[in-house]
A protein has these predicted regions:
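Helix-start (N-cap) detector for alpha-helical repeat units in TPR-like alpha-solenoids
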Residues: 43-45, 78-79, 112-113, 145-147, ...
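Bacterial signal peptide processing site
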Residues: 38-40
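Canonical tetratricopeptide repeat
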Residues: 49, 83, 90, 117, ...
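Terminal, low-structured helical/coil segments at or just beyond the last alpha-helical repeat
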Residues: 317-359
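Structural marker of alpha-solenoid helical repeat scaffolds
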Residues: 73, 107, 141-142, 175, ...
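Structural signature of tandem alpha-helical TPR/SEL1-like repeats
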Residues: 57-66, 91-103, 125-137, 159-171, ...
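Alpha-helical segment of the N-proximal tetratricopeptide repeat
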Residues: 42-73, 86, 90, 120, ...
Length: 359
């Protein structure tokens, strides 16, 4: 489920900052490995340990280099493939991470950590079914982990199994009531169901626990925008962008808010950059359509709205805007048809417009 709201990937916090939850698992696994390793693999082990140091320092390219050296020395080194996958994932190479996790599992089919890590990579590369399969594979070992439950909830969201997602987030918070990611993601789920009060409660609680949780900052921004508080909303999404300057959802959300604040010249380059980074985000295409609508270029606006519709027909108010463009072009029948589809999606603006123009 793509939206302006962001489901934040599961992370944990320690004295060195954020690491993937799997860090705990692979460190435990690696300790066992090295106690048992023979002298013949000492050189590979040293490269592996150097890679771990670089991964902890967030020097991902260096970590990848060391893990690759370890693999050269020991081609069946499942831990090195797994950890190189982590480094690639954090360096925005999702496909490379997926390949490394799969290779680790080819070598060791019982490597539970690699299943857990691959679940995230599959989710981020558009395979939520595969992600769920991997999570189910390790459910017995990790079902009492709050981080596992968050990942499970995220996967169910992508599969539009929202009641299952709710249960997983609830379980995550039962296990650890200050899990910031669980609060952030459950808040996003509430928002998608138009349960705005519990959404805000979860998101504000997440920010109390971690004021620099960028996804929660973004999501609070959109809650404020929903109320029409665009200026206040802008301050929160700008804070999110200070933490994650390249995040395409945040770029798009800032562009959307700038349009609402009648600052289209500032919005246009932001939505363009957002689409360069993620061309499949229906919300960004809607924002670009809104820009063209404001510039009175109906054909360009309609093109973007139709792209958004093809990518995700559940985008809020999409059919209201499609109807407005069709009406502006003199296509009353098509406008009424669009508003009727919006009515089926429970879009208040489309319902109101259809009542005024079509009934």
């Amino acid at each position: 489920m793509k939206s302006r709201f962001l489901i934040r990937n599961t992370k944990i916090t320690n004295s060195t900052g954020y690491r993937p939850v799997a860090w705990l698992f692979f460190m435990l696994y690696a300790t066992v490995c090295f106690l048992a390793c023979s002298n013949a693999t000492d050189e590979a082990a040293q490269f592996f340990l150097k890679g771990n140091v670089q991964l902890q320092k967030r020097e991902y390219k260096e970590a990848i280099r060391y893990y690759s050296e370890a693999i050269t020395k020991k081609p069946d080194f499942a831990d090195a493939y797994n950890n190189r996958g982590l480094a690639k994932f954090r360096n925005d190479d999702r496909e490379g991470a997926l390949a490394d996790y799969t290779r680790a599992l080819d070598i060791d089919p019982d490597f539970n950590t690699a299943y857990f890590n691959r679940a995230e990579a599959r989710l981020e590369t558009g395979d939520p079914g595969g992600s769920l399969s991997d999570l189910q594979r390790v459910e017995k070992q990790y079902r009492d982990s709050t981080f596992y439950q968050v990942r499970l909830g995220d996967t169910y969201v992508r599969l539009t199994k929202l009641s299952d997602a709710q249960s997983a987030y609830d379980r995550a918070l039962q296990l650890k009531n200050d899990n910031v990611e669980a609060l952030t993601n459950r808040g996003a789920l509430y928002y998608s169901q138009k349960a705005y009060q519990p959404a805000e409660a979860d998101i504000r609680r997440a920010l109390q626990l971690n004021p620099k949780q960028d996804a929660a900052l973004n999501n609070l921004s959109l809650l404020l925008a929903h109320r029409g508080n665009y200026a206040d909303a802008l301050t929160y999404v700008e804070q999110a962008l200070e933490l994650q300057p390249r995040q395409p959802y945040y770029l798009n959300n800032k562009a959307y808010l700038l349009l609402k604040l009648n600052r289209p010249s500032e919005a246009f380059p932001l939505v363009q950059e957002s689409l360069q980074r993620d061309s499949q985000n229906a919300w960004a295409h809607q924002t670009l359509g809104l820009y063209w609508l404001g510039q009175k270029q109906s054909d360009k606006a309609l093109t973007e709205f139709r792209i958004a519709e093809k990518l995700d027909a559940s985008v809020d108010q999409l059919y209201y805007y499609i109807g407005m463009v069709e009406m502006a072009k003199g296509n009353r029948a098509r406008a009424c048809e669009a508003w009727q589809r919006g009515e089926l999606a429970n879009d208040d603006l489309a319902i109101k417009q259809r009542a005024l123009q079509c009934l």
